[in-house]
């Protein structure tokens, strides 16, 4: 099969994100190699901003 419209339906088969081994959330992008939630794989420091309200290791950090 080529690269047209029929092949676009095959994109949803594989998982884009898997469980991150640092934060435990299903946010680790396999193709890009980093976690969208904590920044693992891109930075040694935890991805954190003042405007967000997230959980680290399933514990709420404000």
UniProtKB/Swiss-Prot annotation:
Pfam families associated with the record: Ribosomal_L37e
C4-type zinc-finger residues: 20-38
Swiss-Prot/TrEMBL keywords: Metal-binding, Ribonucleoprotein, Ribosomal protein, RNA-binding, rRNA-binding, Zinc, Zinc-finger
Residues the entry annotates as binding Zn(2+): 20, 23, 35, 38
GO annotation terms (biological process): translation
Cofactor-binding details, from the entry: Binds 1 zinc ion per subunit.
Cofactor(s) required for function per UniProt: Zn(2+)
InterPro entries found in the cross-reference section: Ribosomal_eL37, Ribosomal_eL37/eL43, Ribosomal_eL37_CS, Ribosomal_zn-bd
MF terms (GO), sorted A to Z: rRNA binding; structural constituent of ribosome; zinc ion binding
GO CC, alphabetical: cytosolic large ribosomal subunit
Family: Belongs to the eukaryotic ribosomal protein eL37 family.
Role this protein plays: Binds to the 23S rRNA.
Protein known as: Large ribosomal subunit protein eL37
């Amino acid at each position: 099969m080529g690269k047209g419209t029929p092949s676009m339906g095959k994109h949803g088969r594989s998982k884009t994100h898997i469980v991150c081994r640092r934060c435990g959330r299903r946010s680790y992008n396999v193709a890009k190699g980093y976690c969208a939630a904590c920044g693992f794989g891109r930075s040694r420091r935890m991805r954190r901003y003042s405007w967000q309200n997230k959980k680290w290791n399933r514990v709420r950090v404000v």
